Amino acid sequence: MPVDVGTLPPPAPREAVSAAAHLLASVDGDPWGRTSPTVYETARVHAWAPHLPGRDRRVTWLLDQQRAGGLWGDGPPAYQVLPTLAAVTALLAELDRHPEAGHSSLGGRLAAAVAAGLDTLHGLSHHDPLPDTAAVELLVPGLITEVNDRLDAIDPEAAHPALAPVPHGRRLTAVHGIPALPRHRLAERLARFARLPVKLHHCFEALAPVCPPGLVPARPDHLLGSSSAATAAWLATATAAPGAPGLDRLLRSTAARYGGLFPETARITVFERLWVLTTLHRAGLLATFEPLARRWVSALAAPGGVPGVPGFEPDADDTAVTLHLATELGVPYRPEVLDPFRTGDHFACYLGEDTGSVSTNAHVLLALGTWTRHHPDTADHGNTIRLLGRWLVERQHGDGHWDDKWHASPYYATAKVTAALSRHGGPEAADALRRAARWVRETRRTDGSWGIWGGTAEETAYAAQILLDAPEPPTDVLGCAHAHLTARADDDGPPPALWHDKTLFAPDAIVRAEVLSTLRRLDRRLPAPAPVPPGFDAARTGPAD
């Protein structure tokens, strides 16, 4: 049963327990999860399935999302490459489908947006590598090829004047140093598989143009790989397959949920509930809501491991967080569920993983340490805990931070690692914790916030967590974090997109849980009123550095 909001006290400003109650109620009542639509997914769905509800909204939204410099997407230019390629492809497809609109005012906007995007893509420097986002090594080269195919199909005499010069000598040979991937090369790669790996279902839109029928996944029970774009591509290449109308209905319901737009993963309820619960538990905010927490965790604690979203295989990250919560809440679940992910001195996030994840291994360390604390007389996990702690310490950067493939910000990775090491890393982790705290102190912005591209409440919460887990938490800097978070605790707009999927997204409820729980921990740690460094102005919101 969903939480009955009517039985809860109204949320007093910055009153953590009441705010947590309302957050849990909203999560419990939402079967989708709270995440942001993205330019990439919306553009790819529109290119594959323009018939879906919200066509006009998608086109207008994509046009409105273009930045002044010609790119699309969040973050710095390296992050904007993929959404820009997707947006250009979608707008070129729109012009191709409706040539009669080419010389209309809308056609002019479409053509100008495409021309500006292509011009900027041509001029991008590639000094910074592309981010380690999902399947970027397939998606970017494949989209370069698709853009070029669409450019080659333009009739210069019929094109809008803004596009007329584009096809001639303006093909994209490479973007950000990444060359196009010819379709026959992609087909050769796919020919190596007897069965398409499940991890590639999420990016099937990149494979669909050349995927042989024998490799096309069977009709999924959910969105293919929890991706609307992958599902739209599957439908476009398997329209006669049994169950295709059901998938079309799923896409239509996703479009209805997001106003014609699409997030990169739907639905995120498993991931959302686990991260919200473990974050609130850390601050002691779950005691009142243990029946709800047990219900969620009991439903998720599958014997074969926990997939973060429908259509994915189980992964060590979600499984470890489930084990940690189950152990704390008294829900039966055993650490052997993590054994398939063990790889030497650490754990793979999922089978067939290309790059390791420090946040996943931090969650495993926390889960095994928690299990050992609750079950001291059972199987000994001490050696695994020691190896994991050493593996994490060895991956700390010289300035004191960690980074991770699941999040753009080093504050996220560092907070997750220090949370685990401070509890289960032993004395040998103390120096690493001090280095992390020193890095946080040295990277504070002058407006009292922290952030990789600009100060955010989310990253400020992570910074405070790192300091709280330090051997000697600095009261003055914690007071600064408290003041900044308190000034922004009632912000109700969407948080900045910092989490990695195919591009950047923002899991709203998880971010709000991080801020809530951090304020709760700070309230309990600091004297009242919390100290504020001299000259601190909580009202400042502009760039600090």
From Swiss-Prot:
It is an enzyme of class 5 (isomerase). Transmembrane segments: none annotated. A motif (RXXDGSW motif) lies at residues 444-450. It catalyses: (2E,6E,10E)-geranylgeranyl diphosphate = (13E)-labda-7,13-dien-15-yl diphosphate. Its cofactor is Mg(2+). Signal peptide: none annotated. GO terms for biological process: diterpenoid biosynthetic process. InterPro entries: SQ_cyclase_C, Terpene_synthase-like, Terpenoid_cyclase/PrenylTrfase. Its EC number is 5.5.1.30. SUPFAM superfamilies: Terpenoid cyclases/Protein prenyltransferases (SSF48239). One of its GO terms (molecular function) is terpene synthase activity. Involved in the biosynthesis of the labdane-type bicyclic diterpene labda-7,13(16),14-triene. Catalyzes the conversion of geranylgeranyl diphosphate (GGDP) into labda-7,13(E)-dienyl diphosphate. PANTHER family: (E,E)-GERANYLLINALOOL SYNTHASE, ENT-COPALYL DIPHOSPHATE SYNTHASE, CHLOROPLASTIC. The Asp-Xaa-Asp-Asp-Thr-Ala (DXDDTA) and Arg-Xaa-Xaa-Asp-Gly-Ser-Trp (RXXDGSW) motifs are expected to bind to Mg(2+). This is Labda-7,13-dienyl diphosphate synthase. It comes from Streptomyces clavuligerus.
